[in-house]
Amino acid sequence: MNRENFLKFAGMKLSFIPAVGIALLLGTSLCGCDDAVEFHNDPLGNFDALWSVIDRQYCYFDEKDLDWNAIREKYRPMIDSETTQSGLFDILSDMLDELKDGHVNLTAPFSTSYYRAWWSDYPSDFRWRTIQQDYLDFNYYSVSGISYAVFATETGRIGYMYYPSFSTVVGEGSLDYIMSALQDCNGLIIDIRDNGGGLLTNIDVLVGRLIDSEVSGGSIRHKTGPGHDDFSDPYPISYKPADKERVKWNGAPVVLLTNRGCYSAANDFAAVMKSLPNVTLIGARTGGGGGLPFSSELPNGWGIRFSASPITDTEGNPTEFGIDPDIEVHASDQELIEGKDAILNAAVKYLVSNFPD
């Protein structure tokens, strides 16, 4: 799939706009539906509008074995004409939490709902202060949102890159400087722990420095109708090497560090990296977030965002539930406070044992 067209999925938006009443217009390009469903701007009308757009456009009902009709019957009786704005927000937020999806948000003027259990119920496995203080002695460089340094071992050198957010644009020129500084290293650690995602274009930039030929990045589908299984055929996603004038990694082994805090674009990056032959994932399973978000608006003006276009990895597996590491390691909070990062230590040990001859 052409990358420009792929990125258009991320900008999808659907709005509830005034008509004779309040009309929900479901775009034909996304669901193949021409009908308009009217919802009134009252508590029950807003509930029905929200339930309906999720019913027609959300992409993970089957994977999560969700009975959306049963969920409607559970929450709709909680609402009547006397329901307050804050009460309605709480009920709608609780209903959306049934999706167990960190890409789902309900936004009102006074609050934004957010499903936190995808990361809050798991070990943190990371503390940046520990790395700064006990591993780098606060001696490192930072550019384009990436902090980088070199670890010296008895038998070689290991490059280290920490990228905390895909929301920060990675400049090609900045990445040239980083790759040049790490070029004589015998291995590379890319740390994306606690990276909650951001711009998909940064995946292209980073992966392009690690490959010599075009590689598959899995596939994406979009809704073609209101049914829960109405999807297009998969569109392939691919990644190309960086331009020849750019500085690329030297080909030595690479380790990607992950934890449950890796989500959305970081999760997609982990899926692509796991498919590369010279890359090993060490740490904990990522948080998931494998569906591109879709934006909409309720009759009362509240915004709703949710997963609408599912992404699968190179083997056809959904990435919504996270990417497993090749080597599972956890770093306890107590050890991190004491200055020990078991995940980083495991990565160094692995690379030292796999240094090129």
What are these regions (language model features)?
Residues 34-54, 86, 157, 196-357:
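C-terminal "post-core" interaction segments
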Residues 1-31:
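Sec-dependent bacterial lipoprotein signal peptides
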Residues 32-223, 227-238, 295, 303, ...:
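Flexible, low-complexity junctional segments that flank or bridge functional domains
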Residues 6, 12-15, 131-143, 286:
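Short, solvent-exposed secondary-structure boundary motifs
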Residues 13, 17, 22-23, 187-188, ...:
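Generic hydrophobic-segment detector
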Residues 27, 182-184, 248:
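Alpha-helix termination/capping residues and helix-transition junctions
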Residues 12, 22, 28, 103, ...:
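Intrinsically disordered, low-complexity regions
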Residues 9, 14-19, 128, 147, ...:
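Low-complexity, intrinsically disordered short peptide segments enriched in small/polar/basic residues
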